[in-house]
From Swiss-Prot:
Keywords, comma-separated and alphabetical: ATP-binding, DNA damage, DNA repair, DNA-binding, Helicase, Hydrolase, Isomerase, Nucleotide-binding, Nucleus, Phosphoprotein, Transcription, Transcription regulation
Protein name: General transcription and DNA repair factor IIH helicase/translocase subunit XPB
Regulation of its function: Phosphorylation on Ser-751 by CK2 controls the 5'-excision activity of ERCC1-XPF endonuclease; phosphorylated protein inhibits the excision activity and thus NER. ATPase activity is stimulated by TFIIH subunit p52 (GTF2H4). DNA translocase activity by this subunit in TFIIH is stimulated by XPA, ERCC5/XPG and XFP plus ERCC1.
Species: Bos taurus (Bovine)
Motif mapping: DEVH box: 441-444
Length: 782
């Protein structure tokens, strides 16, 4: 094959890798996604036409943001571009934060000043939990140090004027379009498409409008002790003067009152045909009145209640309770997404939601291991009988007879190829059931087209998405707002850490100089083998070995992560440590994990990317990362989550968990590392850069001589490009396993002839045929 053809193909591959390096979950095939119907307001941005810009591009907001006289007592700055800055040291910080989490998206939350951003979707979420347009604008004005810019007020009104005013409610197994605004109902009924969706009686006449008054109260009772909410008492200085302006204090009391009081609401509704629900939803979005889905589970007499309750030992933490109150705030179940850090108890939130609804529940995870863990969580926290839990994976297909809780994976339900007879029977059963609640674990990782497939296969009245990292490099994360529902709650990682609900982690980036021989080859080689060179850097190996020895002497439990299987095996075998990767059998995995948990002699294990989200190891308190998936922010946060669980019986000190990311200096790995840290830095974490590990010279470490390093280099150079690739986990979304690629390879992989190289190439054209080719074309062929 010609040099130019190879160069072009390599250029295309590198361009493709540029996008793949960001996030492995965004691998939807182009053209397969149909555009979701969304309200036009969702694409709106804050109008900044009145903002002056100087010659350097800086924006002058002085005329739009005049300071109030008592600005020192108020915690917010509201900028005309929609960004809101909150002073975390303000005496009224707790209240202001609760309000901002409800109406805006967190951008960055370091120690002293937090940044949020108003978006159309965040305002949709605010309306969905009961906030009115006037509430949002009034509260912002009272909390702000300056006047709120008029552009912000108009943007809030535009996004909230119609959203949340119409609900699709399931009562007694019948669907109703309901609103507390009669004029909105009349406006909708003037549309011919909606009139067609309206249910008619036997004479062909439309059913009557139903007017009723109901009392709404949260289905989650607020705990009296330790609710975790901020105190409503005034903050006073030593002289007894209040630091809080009167209007702010009145506003806080009103917020508490609104949350606690029973509320009587008069609604108008009409019944619609069940078979036309999807068409009705699309038409309402087109009319700028998107339907909010609510499930009146207490009045659902068609679907039987299941025998499930929380055990007395299950005690909700304040943030878990608050997230569930957002979901069940008006006595009905709202569909939406709850965002909690890894290790903060997302599973208990899901189990509590199932115990509250008490209808048949379907749980979907992203792997067979997560299915087993969800089953264990239901048995740990609830009174459900083991016979009522049914698993549906490639390995475990429990009989669904008498089942109330079904647990499966996205890939099992979204599978489109031929199934076994047994799997077909279970799928038929799943399709025919009417599920009260669907819990979607790790909801951010699944492409939108997979959701649409899953959501059309099974019918559920309420959908709850759970995740720790609601981030994607593409724009598909916004699809969750209309495929599942708005974000109901997002916790603050630093607050949970300071309260002791998650571990206090010291994050460190360890810079490992490349040895001269390795760096010479790294600069010369342009293939994927560069990844192997900076992963197998002898100085990185020595740093890893030193950290393992240091923490084992402290009796710490250590996990070492490597995405590259070649490096994983080399490190683990050389250090004589057990390792787990894709082909490791389930029995061997469980044996290694049990030894790691309970055997004091096994304090270190090596794990490939299979452990990113599937493994629950609360004993681990040290994590060392030697290779990773490019610049994936999600993976960095998920791996940190392996050591985030609160530590029991640890020595009281500043940090009780450690996260080390080993990076080879002056390589592409450093740029990836900076990208990976963005999400955690935005959550308030700081990464300490270590250029030299104290005491490393005194240890007896591997690869201390030039001869050993040269032998390692020869081993790396003898490896194939296939060895340099990351592990592809079976059943993982976005995996490239179904794609076919052409590579160079050594014959040793097929016949053992190590010195023979097998290459594919096209025979070049005969030299005689180039005599009559114009020189211009010769030039392009070079």
């Amino acid at each position: 094959m010609g040099k130019r053809d190879r160069a072009d193909r390599e250029k295309k591959k590198s361009k493709k890798r540029h996008y793949e390096d960001e996030e492995d979950e965004e691998d939807d095939a182009p053209g397969n996604d149909t555009q979701e119907a969304v309200p036009s307001a969702a694409g709106k941005q804050v109008d900044e036409s009145g903002t002056k810009v100087d010659e350097y591009g800086a924006k002058d907001y002085r005329l739009q943001m005049p300071l109030k006289d008592d600005h020192t007592s108020r915690p917010l700055w509201v900028a005309p571009d929609g960004h809101i800055f909150l002073e975390a040291f303000s005496p009224v910080y707790k209240y202001a934060q609760d309000f901002l989490v409800a109406i805006a998206e967190p951008v960055c939350r370091p120690t002293h000043v937090h940044e949020y951003k108003l978006t159309a979707y965040s305002l949709y979420a605010a309306v969905s939990v009961g906030l009115q347009t006037s509430d949002i604008t009034d509260y912002l004005r009272k909390l702000s140090k300056t006047g709120v810019p008029e552009g912000i007020i108009q943007f809030i009104k535009l996004c909230t004027v119609s959203y949340g005013k119409v609900k699709l409610v399931l009562k007694h197994n019948r669907y109703f379009v309901e609103s507390s605004h009669p004029d909105v109902i009349q406006h909708l009924l003037q549309d011919p498409v909606i009139r067609e969706c309206r249910l008619r009686n036997s004479e062909g006449e439309a059913t009557e409008l139903i007017t009723e008054t109901f009392t709404s109260k949260s289905a989650i009772a607020k705990s009296v002790e330790g609710s975790g909410g901020p105190s409503t008492s005034r903050v006073t200085d030593p002289q007894g003067k209040s630091d809080i302006p009167t209007d702010l204090f009145d506003f806080y009391e009103q917020m508490d009152k609104d949350e606690e009081e029973e509320e009587e609401t008069q609604t108008v509704s009409f019944e619609v045909k069940q078979e036309m629900i999807e068409e009705l939803q699309k038409r309402c979005i087109h009319l700028e009145y998107p339907l909010l889905a609510e499930y009146d589970f207490r009045n659902d007499s068609v679907n039987p209640d299941i025998n499930i309750d929380l055990k007395p030992t299950a005690v909700l933490r304040p943030y878990q309770e608050k997230s569930l109150r957002k979901m069940f705030g008006n006595g009905r179940a709202r569909s939406g997404v709850i965002v909690l850090p890894c290790g903060a108890g997302k599973s208990l939130v899901g189990v509590t939601a199932a115990c509250t609804v008490r209808k048949r529940c379907l749980v979907l995870g992203n792997s067979a291991v997560s299915v087993e863990q969800w089953k264990a969580q239901f048995k740990m926290w609830s009174t459900i009988d083991d016979s009522q839990i049914c698993r549906f994976t490639s390995d475990a297909k429990d009989k669904p007879i008498g089942c109330s809780i079904a647990i499966s994976t996205y890939s099992m339900l979204g599978h489109t190829t031929k199934r076994s007879w047994e799997a077909e029977r279970v799928m038929e059963w799943l399709k025919t059931q009417e599920w009260g609640l669907m819990i979607l674990d790790e909801v951010h990782t699944i492409p939108a087209k997979m959701f649409r497939r899953v959501l059309t296969i099974v019918q559920a009245h309420c959908k709850l998405g759970l995740t720790a990292t609601l981030v994607r490099e593409d724009d598909k994360i916004v699809d969750l707002n209309f495929l599942i529902g708005p974000k109901l709650y997002e916790a603050n990682w630093m607050e949970l850490q300071n309260s002791g609900y998650i571990a206090k982690v010291q994050c460190a980036e360890v810079w490992c100089p490349m040895s001269p021989e390795f760096y010479r080859e790294y600069v010369a080689i342009k293939t994927k083998k560069r990844i192997l060179l900076y992963t197998m850097n002898p100085n990185k190996f020595r740093a890893c070995q030193f950290l393992i020895k240091f923490h084992e002497r402290r009796n710490d439990k250590i996990i070492v992560f490597a995405d590259n299987v070649f490096a994983l095996k080399e490190y683990a075998i050389r250090l004589n440590k057990p390792y787990i990767y894709g082909p490791t059998s389930q029995g061997e995995r469980m044996q290694i994990l049990q030894n790691f948990k309970h055997n004091p002699k096994i304090n270190t294990i090596f794990i490939s990317k299979v452990g990113d989200t599937s493994f629950d190891l609360p004993e681990a308190n040290v994590l060392i990362q030697i290779s990773s998936h490019g610049g994936s922010r999600r993976q960095e946060a998920q791996r940190l989550g392996r050591v985030l669980r609160a530590k029991k019986g640890m020595v009281a000190e500043e940090y009780n968990a450690f996260f080390y990311s080993l990076v080879s200096q002056d390589t592409q790995e450093m740029a990836y590392s900076t990208k990976r840290q963005r999400f955690l830095v935005d959550q308030g974490y700081s990464f300490k850069v270590i250029t030299k590990l104290a005491g490393m010279e005194e240890e007896d470490l591997a690869f201390s001589t030039k001869e050993e390093q040269q032998q390692l280099l020869q081993k790396v150079l003898a490896a194939t490009d296939l060895d340099a690739e990351e592990e592809v986990v079976a059943g993982e979304f976005g995996s490239k396993s179904s794609q076919v690629s052409r590579r160079f390879g050594t014959m040793s992989s097929m016949s053992g002839a190590d010195d023979t190289v097998y290459m594919e190439y096209h025979s070049s054209r005969s030299k005689t045929s180039t005599k009559h080719v114009h020189p211009l074309f010769k030039r392009f062929r070079k």
